[in-house]
Amino acid sequence: AMIKDELKESFARDIVLLKYLGIHPIIVHGGGPEINQILDILKLPVKFVRGHRVTDDKTMEVVEMVLSGKLNKQIVSLINSKSGNALGISGRDGKLATAEIQKIEVADENGKTELVDVGFVGKITKINKILLQSLLDAKTIPVISPVAEDNNGQALNINADTMAGAIAGALNAEKLILHTE
């Protein structure tokens, strides 16, 4: 996620410019620093395994609150302030993204690997292309938080770059741009 206001403004202007040039941007955002900040305030542990946030039930609540509530709405508002017609959703909305729990492969000092359970961390199994295409056909700029759900309705934390790649692949996108501050 972007922290600096001038970068946020520039990003929003660039996204709206792409739209007016006939390109159909879809935004998938992360929010690691903001999630960490709220976890610290709540005195909940922040732990990663090979770049994946260990996500228990309380952490998943914070992840979804920060990504789908706070940050998604801020990004939508910023793009809309530039006449962008953005619409915020999460991967859970309309079953945009279905996922399954992902275990992370970790090697010990001897090179032996094992699968580690990192909680409610998922890998995408399906993208709802019809929903995405309908949002694009409605001339909106979808702004998507990387929270998906499994077949039982359990919220899963998805790496934003992974979600963006899955969406780009599902839509046969010509370009995938990964942006970070």
Kindly give the residue locations of the regions a language model identified.
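Nucleotide/pyrophosphate-binding catalytic subdomain
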Residues: A1-T180
